[in-house]
């Protein structure tokens, strides 16, 4: 291992021991930073780099165990080697359960400390490599997921579609699809319960099932029944999905299937906003559920907006929800998807999204895209 790329932090209020450890570590090539107290260490705001922490248990003010708790709370991942003059079992157990790598009792042999530090630095190096690999895999999965949602299929001349999806983690359980089937345009949006990788796996599978069903001209209720049966009979940890599939023909006649999802918004060219409110059970929630489609009509200049609950349940710092009424008001003003998404972010006062956030719009015979 390259000692120049690593640093050993030492926190001990005993100046003689602190100095002795500092001299020992420097004599064998380690970079060292010493601190008198736990608070001094926190105030230094240690850099995110390969390191380990040699920490006295009994410190004035914040104890060593208190500092360990603060590091965990602030998601600062530094391997900890505790040193103490009184190694009682409860303290040792608490420290090790919280992730300490070693617990040395004073007086300890120099080689024991050096070996513990070598082990801690190697542990940190390995952990960082694994974290980088994991992040790279998630980034690749995110690119694939976004690619699956890209509106790249040839769209018919009577409609224009645009979608936007932002997961609250690297990948998420929302998706949208737009494709041409025969002379019709089909738009779908779905939200799998939960977040992260597990939801993303189910979302990708569901998206593929819907896509295949549509291209095979399977009726919308049968697509939902097939998906519901597939997910209901498997042990998926209580996962289910809400979704909407909308099919629009060149003359504006349409049909839709809603499975427990937020009712779509229809912004009429006149300025009125209506909702497609007929609904069914979510897929994967109850085996043998029945599904029915409903009809509607779009006129020239009408716009269809579909969203997931990451939009309507976005929360302000005061604990208020963005809500369907607020969204309906913005839709009535003709706001674009980007403007609506920006409004959601502003409503949350710039805080990270708490849920996956997806919007899908479909313009029927517009003079140009309004997204």
Would you name each region that the model predicts?
Residues 130-304, 351-371:
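… and, occasionally, acidic/histidine-rich disordered N-termini of signaling adaptors
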Residues 2-6, 14-33:
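Two-component/phosphorelay signaling modules centered on CheY-like receiver
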Residues 88-90, 108-117:
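C-terminal output helix
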């Amino acid at each position: 291992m390259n000692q120049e790329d690593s640093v050993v932090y030492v926190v001990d209020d005993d100046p003689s021991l602190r100095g002795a450890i500092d001299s020992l570590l420097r004599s064998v090539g380690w970079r060292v930073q010493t601190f008198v107290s736990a608070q001094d260490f926190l105030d230094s705001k240690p850099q995110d780099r390969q390191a380990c922490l040699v920490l006295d248990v009994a410190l004035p003010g914040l104890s060593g165990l208190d500092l360990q708790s603060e590091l965990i709370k602030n998601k600062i991942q530094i391997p900890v080697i505790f040193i103490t003059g009184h190694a009682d079992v409860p303290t040792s157990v608490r420290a090790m359960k919280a992730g300490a790598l070693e617990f040395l009792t004073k007086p300890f042999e120099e080689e024991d400390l050096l070996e513990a530090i070598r082990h801690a630095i190697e542990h940190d190096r390995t952990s960082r490599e694994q974290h980088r690999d994991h992040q790279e895999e998630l980034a690749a999965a995110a690119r694939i997921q976004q690619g699956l949602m890209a509106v790249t299929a040839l769209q018919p001349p009577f409609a224009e579609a645009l979608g936007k999806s932002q997961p609250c983690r690297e990948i998420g359980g929302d998706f949208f699809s737009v494709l041409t089937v025969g002379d019709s345009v089909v738009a779908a949006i779905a939200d799998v319960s939960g977040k992260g990788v597990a939801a993303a796996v189910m979302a990708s599978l569901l998206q593929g099932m819907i896509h295949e069903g549509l291209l095979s001209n399977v009726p919308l209720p049968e697509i939902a029944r097939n998906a519901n049966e597939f997910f209901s009979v498997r042990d998926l940890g209580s996962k289910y999905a809400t979704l909407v599939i909308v099919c629009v023909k060149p003359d504006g006649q349409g049909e839709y299937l809603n499975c427990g999802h937020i009712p779509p918004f229809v912004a009429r060219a006149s300025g009125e906003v209506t909702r497609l409110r007929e609904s069914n059970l979510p897929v994967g929630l109850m085996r043998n559920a029945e599904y029915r489609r409903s009809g509607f009509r779009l006129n020239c200049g009408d716009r269809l907006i579909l969203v997931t609950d990451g939009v309507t349940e976005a929360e302000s710092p005061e604990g208020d929800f963005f809500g369907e009424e607020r969204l309906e008001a913005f839709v009535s003003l003709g706001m674009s998807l980007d403007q609506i998404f920006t409004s959601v972010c502003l409503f949350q006062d710039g805080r990270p999204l708490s849920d996956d956030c997806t919007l899908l719009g479909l313009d029927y015979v517009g003079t140009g895209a309004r997204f």
